[in-house]
Amino acid sequence: MLDLLCPVCGGRLAREKTVWRCESRHSFDVARSGYVNLLPPSASGKRHGDDKRMVAARTAFLSRGYYDHLIGAVAGSCAQLTGPDACVLDAGCGEGTYTRAIYDALAAKGGCPQLLGADISAEAVRRAARQGAGGVFFAVAAASLT
């Protein structure tokens, strides 16, 4: 699996049942729906990325099939360019539509892919985790907030 880094100290995070923790003991709880929020504590309470209404609108639009050809092309390219046991990061995964399609395309090759979907929007990641697939893990994360 992809290594996750602590947003506080930069140390490697390890999963311990329902929490991700670094060697410096900074910890990040895994939500009931299965995702982890890795935004730094200084970002707590602030809204980042899409809100619930925006995520719902995007999900409704994508469910109408307008982008199915593009989603299929992206997933197919990933399957073609990687092995069936690939470890893939979907940075800016939104509500997980592309992430799940990539997972399905890789799994169809008979492998056991591992995908990490990351987005700065907690609402989008919540929805992605609720609709997730095996082998897909979602995190609220950002490379930098400055």
Predicted feature locations:
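Conserved class I S-adenosyl-L-methionine
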Residues: 85-94
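Conserved SAM/SAH-binding beta-strand->alpha-helix loop
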Residues: 121-123
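Conserved SAM-binding loop
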Residues: 128-129
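N-terminal auxiliary segments of SAM/dcSAM-dependent transferases
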Residues: 1-48
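Conserved SAM-binding strand-loop segment of SAM-dependent methyltransferases
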Residues: 133-144
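Class I SAM-dependent methyltransferase Rossmann-like catalytic core
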Residues: 51-73
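Conserved SAM-binding motif I beta-strand of class I
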Residues: 114-119
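Conserved SAM-binding loop of SAM-dependent methyltransferases across substrates and taxa
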Residues: 95-110
